[in-house]
């Protein structure tokens, strides 16, 4: 009775503390964020007790809707969700910290981007990318803390699939009724064949393709793992939406990356299907519209305008890396853009169209090594789950995550995958799924 009384008193004190914290937050953030944002921050803190009791639901709703949210709301939402879990761990004692070896590379990333931000050639320019990556780490920690079983993983992955369905439906509607194409999106030689490209909420078809590359293997793994016929039908439908949207982006890098993802998924999950998948894919090419088929066939054409444009960007970016080899020009795209334009004024670009060159330009060889550590550890831990788990469902989920990582790494050869905030967030989500499966595998074994 005495223990229950103490717990009740603590909860009363905490509930009284929220209004005080919200008033303080409103007053302190009013000057820097403006009235509307400051009011929203205060409102979120006031609502914390309600959402704290439903934090897993809140996390899932965030994962469904965040692609449609403004960056600032996404940022605040990510920190608010982590705050709910921290309160539950340290105040209410309803959650426990889930320990993982992957926290080491995550901590390494945080320390590096913090230093790289404040040693940047444009500190304020770097803060945008720094804050979004920290928000991504916040969601990473929330997901890893919340997923304790394969059922929890299934709920999180299903929320991502539902969000992907909405994003793709909007992309298809946008392509059909509001279709547009900007000059820089299409090669001059084929501009007459492509009158529109799908971009959904991402405002760029290549970025939309990055999102699809990350999500498609996750959704396929859900389809593969579920035995229920209705659920299989739903996930198959979402997979169809993702693949249709990918074709409507006309992103050659995206199509190639999803192809690699498919091979990785089948190699680790069911190798005999590879022999059927490749000829089936080649046969399917004949049924595609001519504009899409020609776009895919142009992958091998290194002389088209967009490819030659990229070659020139890569060449200049290599010069940036040579001139800033140790720690780069600073974290984020703004320091890179400002530095790049000192080399050539006639190419006002935002990034290097290659993640690996971009990372070296921003962070030097130190940043590139940090990036490699995260990539290698995430791949190794996921492969270990595949080979060590005794549960076929967990193995299938892990194959989906590994295929997602492999696909986005391939896509990173043609685009900067850590430039747009929505993609940065999704990458941290995929890393969280990988880490969670490692924990589940160890517990079940």
Where are the model-predicted features located?
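A membrane-periplasm/extracellular boundary helix in multi-pass inner-membrane enzymes
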Residues: 169, 175-178, 266-305, 315-323, ...
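Membrane-interface micro-motifs in multi-pass membrane enzymes
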Residues: 32-37, 71-78, 128-129, 200-212, ...
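Transmembrane signal-anchor hairpin modules in multi-pass inner-membrane enzymes, especially those
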Residues: 1-115, 124-125, 151-154, 158, ...
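Loop-to-helix entry and N-terminal half of a specific, functionally important transmembrane alpha helix
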Residues: 383-414, 430, 434
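Alpha-helical transmembrane segments of multi-pass inner-membrane proteins
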Residues: 23, 27, 32, 42-47, ...
């Amino acid at each position: 009775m005495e223990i229950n009384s103490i717990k009740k008193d603590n909860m009363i004190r905490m509930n009284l503390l929220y209004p005080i914290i919200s008033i303080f937050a409103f007053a302190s953030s009013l000057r820097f964020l403006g009235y509307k944002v400051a009011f929203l921050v205060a409102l979120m803190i006031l609502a914390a007790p309600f959402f704290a009791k439903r934090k897993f639901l809140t996390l899932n709703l965030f994962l469904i809707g965040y692609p449609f949210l403004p960056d600032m709301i996404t940022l605040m939402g990510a920190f608010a969700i982590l705050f709910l879990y921290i309160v539950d761990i340290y105040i209410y004692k309803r959650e426990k910290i889930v320990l993982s070896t992957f926290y080491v590379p995550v901590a390494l990333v945080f320390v590096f981007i913090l230093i790289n931000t404040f040693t940047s050639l444009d500190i304020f320019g770097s803060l945008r990318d720094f804050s979004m990556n920290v928000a991504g780490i916040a969601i990473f920690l929330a997901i890893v803390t919340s997923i304790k079983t394969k059922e929890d993983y299934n709920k999180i992955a299903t929320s991502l699939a539902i969000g992907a369905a909405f994003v793709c439906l909007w992309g298809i509607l946008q392509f059909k009724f509001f279709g547009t194409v900007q000059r820089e999106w299409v090669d001059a030689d084929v501009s007459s064949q492509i009158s529109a490209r799908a971009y959904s909420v991402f405002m760029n078809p290549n970025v939309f393709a990055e999102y699809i590359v990350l999500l498609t293997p996750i959704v396929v793994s859900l389809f593969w793992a579920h035995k229920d016929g209705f659920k299989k039908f739903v996930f198959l439908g979402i997979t169809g939406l993702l693949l249709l949207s990918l074709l409507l982006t006309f992103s050659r890098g995206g199509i190639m990356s999803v192809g690699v993802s498919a091979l990785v998924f089948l190699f680790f999950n069911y190798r005999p299907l590879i022999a059927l998948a490749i000829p089936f894919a080649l046969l399917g090419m004949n049924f595609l519209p001519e504009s899409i088929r020609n776009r895919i066939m142009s992958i091998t054409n290194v002389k088209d305008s967009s490819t030659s444009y990229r070659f020139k960007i890569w060449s200049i970016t290599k010069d940036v890396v040579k001139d800033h080899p140790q720690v780069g020009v600073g974290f984020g795209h703004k320091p890179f853009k400002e530095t790049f334009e000192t080399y050539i004024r006639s190419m006002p670009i935002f990034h290097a169209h290659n993640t690996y060159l971009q990372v070296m330009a921003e962070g030097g060889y130190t940043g590139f090594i940090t990036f490699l550590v995260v990539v290698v550890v995430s791949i190794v831990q996921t492969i270990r789950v595949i080979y060590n788990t005794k549960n076929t469902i967990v193995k299938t989920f892990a194959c989906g995550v590994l295929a997602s990582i492999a696909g986005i790494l391939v896509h990173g050869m043609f685009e900067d995958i850590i430039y747009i905030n929505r993609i940065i967030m999704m990458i941290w989500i995929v890393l969280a799924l990988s880490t969670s499966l490692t924990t589940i595998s160890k517990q079940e074994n």
